Amino acid sequence: MSRPVRRSPRELTESWPDMPAVDPSGEVARRFAENLRKAMDGRSHRATAELTGVNYSTIQSILSGRAWPDLYTIAKLEAGLNAPLWPGLLRSDE
């Protein structure tokens, strides 16, 4: 039995990353990407990759909403950028 295909984060919002996602998982991914972009502080994808040890194409995929970051990637990005990126618990009133 095959696994169902998981939609990408960008498919869970009308306009990535500008519009909030109705799906809570998509909204966490969108906010994570926003936090990552802010923490990059103008650095290029390649400079961020060198700093964090995360492949630049993975960084591009997260920022464009094409990929779901895994825990290993999240930890490497947060450590390398010395910034909290995970948006935390989203409440239904947000």
Report each predicted region and the residues it spans:
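Helix-turn-helix DNA-binding elements, focusing on the entry/boundary residues of the two helices
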Residues: 45, 56, 71-74
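DNA major-groove recognition helix of helix-turn-helix/homeodomain DNA-binding modules
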Residues: 72-87
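Recognition helix of helix-turn-helix/homeodomain-like DNA-binding domains
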Residues: 53-69
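Positions that flank functional sites
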Residues: 55, 92-93
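DNA-binding alpha-helical recognition surfaces that contact promoter or target DNA
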Residues: 34, 38, 61, 76-79, ...
